[in-house]
Amino acid sequence: MPSSRTCVGVVFGGASEEHAVSIRSAITVVGALRSEVNNNRFEVIAIYIDQRGRWWPAGVAEAVLKQGHPAKPEQLSTPLAPQGFTKLPEGSERVQVWYPVLHGPNGEDGTVQGLFTLMGQPFVGSGVLGSALSMDKLAMKAAFAAAGLPQVPYAAVDAADLLETESRQGVAKHLEAKLKYPCFVKPANLGSSVGISKAQNRNELLIGLDKAASLDRRIVVEQGVSARELECAVLGKRELQTSVVGEICFDADWYDYDTKYSENCSHTLIPAPLPEGVEAQIRTLALQACRCVAAHGMARVDFFYNAARNEIWLNEINTLPGFTSQSMYPMLWEASGVTLEELVSQLVITARE
């Protein structure tokens, strides 16, 4: 007799700098799907992608989830498959809905979404276009600019222009003419604050550019602003819904990778204490930003807010936001009356619409 439960394929890990974060997120997601509330609704098949892009079946995936860190060489069968995707692991034929819990390139950028689309199977999150546009900060910012959405001044840099001394200095002069210090240098296609540097002068700017160029050929440099960091969660496909707005507070100079994923380095205020009308503005902008880049399913939209100037700037969209114990997306929905168990259930249901 066929099972009445929906079989969900949770894919995590990935050939990305954010591999470890993906594992932490997957532990939360799988736990919520297998909770007492959801046990009669879903069957979970976990699939692990190692750091070379090879896909592994449930046996390996469950071991990684249990240990909470990447698979060790002895846990992987030999001889190893070639690098990258070759075929779906055993058991995948039973999957009815795919749930990618992947962060960064090769997972959040439209690549895996394209695979699921070719397979003709539903999946959680945005499609190819929304994922790709939202992942690439330069493409995303160009879309925001075309729609007239507010954002801080920025400039684009091609890593090829940093190879020679003369061209490097030319890039620095161009950036200094367009932006003021401090500024932030970011690889265009990485998340979780990976590869981001703050520059207070030309020397730090060039060091930051080299760091970003080692990770991505496309680089974005943003004007630093004095602002609070706010976030709003979005859920839905045909009809997008927004959560309450939350604020990230931290003692560090800026919200870098260590601050984001270390215990006791930051705290959140949910809902954020905001003047009347500001939360409504942010929630409206979050919807506009998602529609602008064709993001749906789920997204976390990040903002800067300067209270003295009463100015709001869009920072970025994350179409596969983290689900770790410190991640804002599930916390924002919890504060909006949607439990973690209800949230993952709704995401799977939305994927089938």
From Swiss-Prot:
Any single biological process term in GO: cell wall organization
Major localization class: cytoplasm
The EC number(s) attached to this protein equal 6.3.2.4
Boundaries of every ATP-grasp domain copy? 141-349
Q: Entry's InterPro entries?
A: ATP-grasp, ATP_grasp_subdomain_1, D-Ala_lig_Van_CS, D_ala_D_ala, Dala_Dala_lig_C, Dala_Dala_lig_N, PreATP-grasp_dom_sf
Q: What class of enzyme is it?
A: ligase
Q: In its UniProt entry, what is this protein called? A: D-alanine--D-alanine ligase
- Encoding gene per record: ddl
